[in-house]
Design a protein with these regions (language model features):
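SAM-dependent nucleic-acid methyltransferase catalytic core
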Residues: 3-8, 12-13, 29-45, 52, ...
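Short, basic/polar, glycine-containing "phosphate-handling" surface segments that engage DNA
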Residues: 1-189, 244-284, 293, 513, ...
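Polybasic, glycine- and aromatic-enriched phosphate-binding surface used to engage nucleic acids
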Residues: 50, 66-74, 90, 524, ...
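Preference for the N-terminal adenyl/adenosyl cofactor-binding alpha/beta module
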Residues: 114, 118-364, 393-402, 440-448, ...
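Flexible phosphate/Mg2+-sensing switch loops adjacent to catalytic phosphate-binding sites
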Residues: 193-198, 324-343, 365-389, 410-432
Length: 919
């Protein structure tokens, strides 16, 4: 179930007569509990409640209370030992009249009438594996409205298949935007009479729905016709009550899709919702997926929370406006100057979606302007901040439509909030006729033509707002000469997930600038164009982006050329989790990076709730000089060579579980000579066991004598022949071997390719000469043990985390980026002896806790004291080699490592990642 299906199920449950015995199970069913789970809870097999309730382990403890005893029941649930033992996330008590619940992790409490509990369904979304931000959890209206509109959209498509074609898709999307406006307008007195639109459709159309589209067409036509022209236009008398809207929202075709009885019912139900509660930023981001067949199942996936949007907007320009407001105090002249400045500010989102960033920027600026007007004694003054100064580019037409509509709604709501409903209504209609959101490809549109510093070369004013061609990219500004701030959350899309078209777009942009782009994220194009915009103007830009653009190889590939445009990073937000409404969404690790033309101004680094002024910010988001770490083919410190492990690409046919190995040896004992222990990241960290078939070229025929081995070789062959990669197909005949073999037959230090960021150290291991390392490990063969101490140090972890990048938040290791670039002072024999002893102590401490695995031993909350002491001693010895003492913190560690890296590579030619090399 997704959030919208859950909301419908919960609403249905609340409308049914209350059944005390069945409620707990119906509640869990609404959140997606399976029949087998419910059956076992009903029978008592898994229900471990100790107070006569229903307890679902790790989820919720529910108690149906006697009438009037809900508060006491909630207390009993909270103090219940079973609640604690089962690690329940929630407790819930109800008597069918009152409803109380508590989130045991946050302490957040719900108290309401039973019939109103569906309004808080977002509170319980974690029960369905949906983790999301507070704003969405509390926005039950937006979820409900989007879910209902989605059902209507699907039903209309079913009855009007021609409206789903590319030829008419835009008309369908435009129709949905018109409906949303009508629902909002009838509940906010814009239509002067509550439920005017819904009531008119219900009263004037037949219950069999045969003429529903005709009635709606007449209403739309009325709203596109001035009062004096309505008689000649043949507007029905009953439609004359609708105002003239203008703005192009109802211009052009007034065709309406045919409604079935089901679609008509959906429409009337949607009209019955309270549209005054709409949040244009939340609703817009949810509704934009309705018109996308591929995304309809993940409504809400585009939402960026207000706190995360403000991580961009506040340091970009809003903080400065608030500081100037504070400085102005009650000085009328200073307040007037600030208001004048704000009226000329342009906010430009070149990947605006449904307008989240633009809407929040507008609302925040209106809040500041309202305070200015209040201090000047002009609280009801009309806003001087025009919507036309909020610009956007959006690839798809429906989100572009919704972005325009969201801004209109935000303007009206702001007028009501700061000036009163009377003034807001007096000036709302007819809508302004200017266009401010362009539908098109941001990588193909000239941003300066859309949002130039002093207007545009081609000044085109449209006849109306929504009738303007969505591809129009040259629109003049109402206020010229102001500041421009670019912002947004452009598409990330890693290099391996880009389409051919997206690759071509990057090629068109970067080839002419000499930037090797094949391993760059898609969002790098937005940073490039923003930097060019800043270079040519006095603009500034800030984008939310995955942290990968400030880590690993992308720093070396992108940032040197980008910073040569005479721009600088002037603020950055340290990595944080960005989550949306998608089910089982763990979130993406993001950063915010702010760019401007070099000007010597202040720079800031934000992390958690702290703000730190720094002297510089490099592309790794560190207070250090601009250093770019490329791939190195060998260790700059002269350490022994580290290779990637051996890659099977075998369809799983050369790898055996312990049980498969036992079965094979039971039937073919002679096959034991062809089996070896196999180690990847999971085997090293979690202590798992696997084996592989390892056959030399001169042993193939002998191995094939074992039937199961021969069968497995044939499966490997078929798997490789079916591959899309020619290099893999060529190796189909070598089906007895791993496809890439680096080295084997020697003892090795191994380092996992990916490991948890929660551990204080990268969990290195050792394998024996008869054991095989997979490509999920990096290996140093026949090593000296002091290298184990270096790789197991805090210093090495901090370096790798910074220059190699991350997979989500996990540490992603690289030999060519992390190990080979790690700088070391010259080690004396005594240094090596001391480090060898440290490595031995770490290994002995691990051995003392056998059979505990690495994952358990290196859990930061459970790490044994002797193992921690061994690592502390290792860090002490290694760090003393650098500076004669322990480093005070990770910042000091990185500063020293970057300084030493710069010295060790100064004047040396770099074998970068642009040169093919053996890993």
């Amino acid at each position: 179930l997704n959030a919208f299906e859950i909301e419908e199920a919960i609403s249905s449950l609340a409308e049914q007569p209350f059944d005390a015995s069945d409620f707990p199970f119906l509640f869990l069913q609404a959140f997606g509990a399976k029949e087998t789970t419910l059956r076992r809870l009903r029978s008592g097999d898994t229900n471990k409640s100790d107070i006569g309730g229903v307890l679902q382990t790790t989820n919720i403890h529910i108690k149906v209370a006697a009438t009037g005893a809900v508060t006491d029941a909630l207390k009993d649930l909270k103090s219940s030992p079973a609640t604690s033992r089962a690690k329940a996330k929630f407790i819930l008590a109800t008597d069918g009249l009152d409803f109380q619940a508590e989130d045991l992790n946050t302490g957040e409490v719900i108290v309401c009438e039973y019939r109103k509990f569906p309004e808080f369904f977002g509170f319980f979304l974690p029960l369905a594996g949906i983790s999301t931000v507070k704003q969405i959890r509390e926005s039950s209206f937006d979820i409900k409205a989007t879910g209902r509109l989605n059902r209507l959209y699907v039903e209309l498509q079913k009855d009007n298949p021609e409206w789903s074609t590319s030829a008419r898709r835009h008309e369908m999307n435009h129709f949905m935007a018109r409906l949303i406006f009508c629902f909002f307008a009838e509940d906010t007195d814009i239509f002067m009479k509550e439920t005017l639109f819904t009531a008119t459709v219900e009263q004037m159309s037949s219950k069999d729905s045969s003429d529903t589209h005709v009635v709606i067409e007449a209403i739309f036509k009325a709203m596109n016709t001035r009062s004096e022209d309505r008689a000649s236009a043949g507007i029905p008398r009953w439609a004359n009550v609708f105002p003239y809207v203008n703005g192009g929202l109802f211009s052009g075709s007034t065709d309406v899709p045919v409604f079935s009885k089901i679609a008509r019912t959906y429409l009337l139900h949607i009209g019955g919702l309270d549209w005054k509660k709409i949040n244009p930023d939340i609703f817009g981001s949810m509704i934009q997926a309705v018109a996308d067949d591929d995304e309809r199942g993940s409504l809400g996936m585009h939402y960026t929370s207000v706190p995360n949007i403000l991580k961009v907007l506040n340091p970009l320009f809003l903080d400065d406006l608030r500081e100037k407001l504070e400085e102005a105090g009650d000085n009328p002249r200073k307040l007037l100057n600030l208001r004048s400045r704000m009226s000329k500010i342009r906010v430009f989102d070149p990947a605006c979606g449904s307008g989240n960033f633009l809407v929040i920027a507008y609302k925040q600026m209106r809040e500041i302007e309202a305070e200015i007007n209040k201090r000047r004694g002009e609280p009801e003054r009309r806003s001087e901040i025009p919507l036309t100064n909020f610009r956007g580019i959006e690839l798809r037409d429906f989100p572009a439509e919704i972005a325009r509509l969201a801004l209109i709604i935000a303007e009206y709501q702001s007028d009501v909030l700061y000036r009163g409903q009377k003034e807001a209504l007096a000036e709302f209609l007819p809508l302004d006729s200017k266009n401010w959101v362009t539908c098109g490809n941001a990588l193909e549109i000239d941003w300066l033509s859309l949002c130039g510093p002093t207007g545009t070369g081609v000044k085109i004013r449209s006849k109306d707002l929504f009738g303007t061609p969505l591809h129009q990219a040259e629109i003049d500004f109402e206020n010229e000469g102001g500041e421009t701030y670019m912002c947004g959350n452009p598409p990330y899309i890693g290099s391996s997930k880009q389409t051919k078209e997206q690759k071509n777009e990057l090629a068109n942009l970067f080839n002419r600038n000499g930037v090797k782009f094949k391993n760059l994220d898609y969002i790098s194009a937005w940073f490039w164009l923003a930097a060019e915009f800043c270079r040519l103007t006095q603009a500034a830009a800030a984008f939310v982006t995955t942290n990968s653009i400030c880590q690993g190889e992308q720093v070396f590939l992108l940032w040197p050329a980008l910073l040569r445009k005479d721009v600088e990073i002037f603020f950055a937000q340290a990595p944080f989790k960005w989550a949306n409404l998608a089910q089982n969404n763990a979130g993406v690790t993001c950063v915010v990076v702010g760019l401007r033309r070099k000007n010597g101004g202040k720079k800031y680094l934000f992390f958690e709730d702290q703000k730190k002024e720094v002297t510089r910010l490099n592309p790794y988001l560190l207070d250090f000089d601009d250093v770019f770490i490329p791939r190195h083919s060998e260790s700059i410190a002269g350490l022994p060579r580290m290779l990637k492990g051996n890659q099977p690409t075998d369809g799983g046919n050369l790898i055996l579980s312990p049980e498969e190995r036992r079965n094979l040896l039971a039937s073919s004992p002679d096959a034991s000579r062809f089996l070896r222990p196999l180690y990847g990241s999971k085997e090293i960290i979690d202590g798992l066991q696997r084996y592989c078939i390892w056959v030399e070229d001169d042993e193939v025929e002998e191995a094939k004598a074992t039937t199961e081995l021969a069968v497995r070789f044939e499966k490997v062959k078929q798997s490789r022949l079916e591959s899309g990669a020619e290099s893999t197909r060529k190796r189909a005949l070598d089906s007895h071997r791993f496809i890439q073999i680096q080295e084997y037959g020697k003892a090795a230090i191994v380092v996992p390719e990916v490991s948890s960021e929660k551990r204080g150290y990268i969990p290195c291991g050792l394998i024996k000469s008869n054991e095989i390392a997979t490509n999920k490990l990096f290996a140093i063969y026949e090593p000296k043990l002091f290298v184990f101490a270096i790789c197991s140090s805090r210093l090495h972890r901090v370096w790798v985390e910074t220059v190699c990048g991350k997979l989500e938040e996990r540490i992603s290791y690289s030999n060519v980026l992390g190990y080979n670039t790690f700088s070391l002072p010259n080690l004396t024999e005594k240094n090596k002896t001391d480090l060898t002893r440290c490595a031995e102590d770490i290994l002995l401490a691990r051995e003392a806790h056998f059979p505990a695995n690495i994952a358990h031993l290196y859990d930061p909350e459970k790490m044994p004291a002797d193992l921690k002491a061994a690592h502390d001693r290792n860090d002490e010895v290694l760090e003393a080699i650098y500076i004669g003492r322990r480093f005070r913190n990770d910042t000091e560690r990185l500063e020293k490592l970057f300084e030493l890296y710069t010295k060790m590579t100064s004047g040396k030619p770099t074998k970068s990642g642009n040169i093919k090399m053996k890993a």
